[in-house]
Amino acid sequence: MPADPVPPLDPLGAAYVDLAFAVERHAPGFIDGYFGPPSVREAAEAAPTAAPADLQRRAGDLTAAIDAADLPDARRDFLRRQAVAMAATLRRLAGEAIPYREEVRLLYDIEAEQTPEARFEAAIAELDDLLPGRGPVGERMVAWRDQFTVTPEGARRLIDVIVPELRRRTETIVPLPADEAVEFRFVSDRPWSGYNWYLGNNRSRVELNTDLPIHATRLTDLLAHEGYPGHHTEHALKERLYLDHGRGEQSILLINTPECVVSEGIATLAEEAVFNPGELVDFRSEVVYPAAGLSGDPAREIAIGRAQRGLKGVDANAALLLHDAGRGDDEVVAYLTRYGLESEARARHRLRFIRDPLWRAYIFTYHAGHGLLGRWLAAAPDAEARRARFRTLLTEAVTPTWVRQAMATDPIV
């Protein structure tokens, strides 16, 4: 067998990775990416499939080993909370019925909080004033979005002008590896609108789902989310924790663990991390719209986008209706159309995501991640401190608890 092209895993990292591959046998898709030694993957895939109950015991052994090891506090916190999440997944795989809110807490180190509908009503009232035309706000919202729809070919042209600017601005926050790269592809029949597959060695493949309309007004945000300074940037920089610092757990990316809250928080804040509102207006009006052959009012559209942030908790509330309150599909779709201002087709696509066994709790990572990380960044005393905090999130493996503690002590990072 040829030598592995990357460093070996440390014992604790190896135990963590082995357990993750064992969980993947029962929950396909649990591993979002692996870029450690190929021999470790090959050995794990060749091993007999262990029962979830046996894997629960291994998760307990891993937690005990983490507690006994001489580790920096931040690494211990990361490993321990990831192990707790794996143990919770194994409990469900073993047939245990975990209440939905407890499941969210164990998987993600956050609470499954319901957003008051009064907040949605206030956002909808603001949108009623901002959106052109007359009639129901939801219909006007859909019509407003649809006027900015571009074809996949048009989106490809926009990618070519948007991504270089996002990358340039990202490098004002943190240096990027010289050989990093992202490939963009268009796909269909997926439960999400866009997805980053991190391949290791500073490479990503980003897939955009053509089942859903691609809007020029949202494309900068989507590309920032998936690429610069979002998922691709974070994964490329955190891979260095494995390659340069021997942290084997950073050779693998796992779904349904606390790292997802931080990752989605980074991604949902990515566009505003590199553009202030005035810069975004200028970029859209001077670069994006001419390239798309569109005309518009970027200042108004950005104001509409800001008002839409008040609807960020709608999907999470819908998930609570479905999984916690036991409401039916039609009621959940009606909730999404009423408060999310979605078309019925798009609402049913959202329902597909929150009903999927792998993704059923994941919806909380977006809302909670944006809120938690956004509050910490907003509390920084100045723009340079905000950039430093965002850089920390991109380069250090931290948990939601770490961010909450950082806010409590308010360090200048």
Set out the residue ranges of the language-model regions.
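N-terminal maturation segment of proteins
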Residues: 1-413
